[in-house]
Amino acid sequence: GYEAKYGDKMSSVLDITYKKPERLEGSASVSLLGASAYVGIATKKLTWTNGIRYKTNQYLLGTLDTKGEYDPRYIDYQTYLNWTPSKRWEVGVIGNISENRYNFQPEDRYTRFGTLSNVREFKVYFEGQEKDLFRTLFGTAYATYRLNEQNSLTLQASAFHTKEQETYDITGQYWLNSLDSGTQVDGTTNEEETSETIGVGTYMEHARNYLTAEVQSYSITGRHRLKSHSLQWGAEFKRERIKDRMREWEMRDSAGYSMPQTSEGPELFYTLRSRNETDSKRYGFYLQDTYRFRSTAGLFTLTAGIRGSYWDWNKEFIFSPRASLALIPAFNEK
């Protein structure tokens, strides 16, 4: 596992240190798949970074077997503002807005499969469209107070909101054919002709899926240095609200017969209806100590700590002791 300060993460951790520009700077790039730009501003007490990206893989999706009008678009904006009014205080704001839209109007699909002696051809003609939306908003504000060079306290508040919707109504009419391989008069090239129609049919797919989630978090953390020890602690309160609604169904009609067939009449091949809502609170704390010492072998770092968390949704309390030992060999310290 990982250090106690990293929460309940046991398989992966993303620990980011944000860049602080030292002067006015910027960059930009443009390609067939999108564009990006960055601007950094710096004064004696303030730094501000801004970045924006736009991407589209419309040209890549055009090479798929299913032909149609693909219109995928992704855009996001990130900002980081840091203000240091004095040697003791540091205030920062981090924000992120991202939106991913996927619009698709399928037209037809043409696929061949099988072996050299048994070739199949699958054709589908579509009507309808799909519209998907994924939007995320994230913001964090923090204030750090340094009592001295060895002790500091940080208050932090953050909020996260996401909205996802998947909607489509698509009808497809398909033909499955068997192909015969023949030889031209000169005997140099093989040509394929449709010899038999194995199956025809129609299917309809419908979906109205919506998901919204909100997470609010408030925390206080502290850091204290005592000679070779670095003591860190923290407490956190988090509220999570999730709303999920799914409506999906699929109808299949093979050669004029609705599938599946029952004695009570035609039924849908697949259907899904669900509605879920959760409103829960999480409480957590951690305490850990990092001790560094040298020997002839190199620099050792011993980290040990405890973490506790409680989730009122399942009334479960988790207590997690953690420890790790790292070594930088002496020949690597140079």
List each model region and its residues:
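Transmembrane beta-strands of outer-membrane beta-barrel pores
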Residues: Y18, L32-G34, T43-K45, Y54-Q58, ...
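Transmembrane beta-barrel wall of Gram-negative outer-membrane proteins
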Residues: S27, S31-Y54, K67-P106, E130-H161
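Outer-membrane beta-barrel channels and translocator barrels
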Residues: P21, L33, T43-L46, T84-R88, ...
